[in-house]
């Protein structure tokens, strides 16, 4: 029989691994994990309400509902905030629900795309995750985390492709968590005036230090998502995606989802 310390470590490691995947999806370009360099236009806004989640062997975690707000504060730059209600449903233990970690960020496009040439759009989107969730209940990391990505995008008629990645600072005191990398790339097509469909593939290095009690928690993950964006009109949009892991799926990503509604203005 495992000791209480071992059991606590296992629960923490599972939560850390799943939270890392969820955080990656939350800070992405909805409904995907991969983001783009394009900010909200100056003095415009985006407001999302959404649910995201990931299931692994022995746990399902996610956010429902969560709220995301982006505002074009300056030309080529937007501010960003996500405030989620988070759930954790581990096998053999009580489910938890409450306030999750708060995300703040600023996206800045420093190279604009040459529509008629080869130059892509390039931007950065640094993020910080504040520990507003209760880590003891599996609802947050329990410490400050930060992400520093670079994103690139190019369009060709009805096709758009973008991707990139960056480095997550993820080491908390007295935890086995460690810094890691995330990379992703996406291809999307505007099928009709109202409907866009896309697919992405992504890779994330291990979020837990090697030498942990259970080696399963130290595994990297590679996965994919298929998604769609439907525009009801210029202000109202439906976003959804689903996917799974291709590498170490039982321990990192058996199934993941995003379902959201977006309102844009003015």
What are these regions (language model features)?
Residues 26-266:
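Transmembrane beta-barrel domains of Gram-negative outer membranes and organellar outer membranes
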Residues 1-31, 266:
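Cleavable N-terminal export/targeting peptides
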């Amino acid at each position: 029989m495992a000791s209480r310390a071992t059991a606590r470590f296992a629960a923490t490691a599972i939560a850390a691994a799943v939270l890392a995947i969820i955080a990656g999806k939350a800070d992405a370009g909805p409904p995907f994990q991969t983001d783009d360099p394009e900010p909200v236009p100056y003095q415009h806004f985006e407001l999302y309400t959404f649910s995201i989640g990931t299931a692994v062997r022995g746990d399902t975690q996610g956010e429902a509902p969560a709220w995301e707000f982006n505002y074009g504060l300056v030309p080529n730059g937007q501010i960003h905030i996500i405030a989620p209600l988070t759930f954790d449903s581990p096998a053999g233990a009580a489910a938890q629900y409450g306030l999750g970690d708060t995300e703040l960020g600023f996206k800045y496009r420093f190279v604009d795309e040459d529509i008629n040439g080869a130059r892509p759009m390039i931007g950065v989107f640094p993020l910080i995750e504040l520990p507003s969730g209760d880590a003891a209940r599996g609802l947050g990391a329990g410490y400050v985390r930060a992400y520093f990505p670079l994103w690139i995008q190019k369009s060709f008629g009805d096709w758009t492709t973008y991707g990139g990645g960056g480095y997550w600072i993820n080491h908390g005191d007295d935890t086995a968590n460690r810094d890691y990398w995330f990379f992703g790339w996406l291809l999307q097509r505007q099928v009709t005036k109202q409907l866009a469909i896309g697919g992405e593939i992504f890779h994330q290095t291990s979020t837990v230090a090697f030498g942990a009690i259970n080696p399963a928690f130290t595994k990297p993950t590679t996965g994919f998502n298929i998604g769609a964006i439907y525009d009801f009109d210029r202000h109202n949009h439906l976003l959804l995606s689903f996917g799974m892991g291709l590498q170490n799926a039982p321990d990192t990503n058996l199934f993941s989802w995003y379902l959201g509604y977006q309102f844009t203005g003015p």
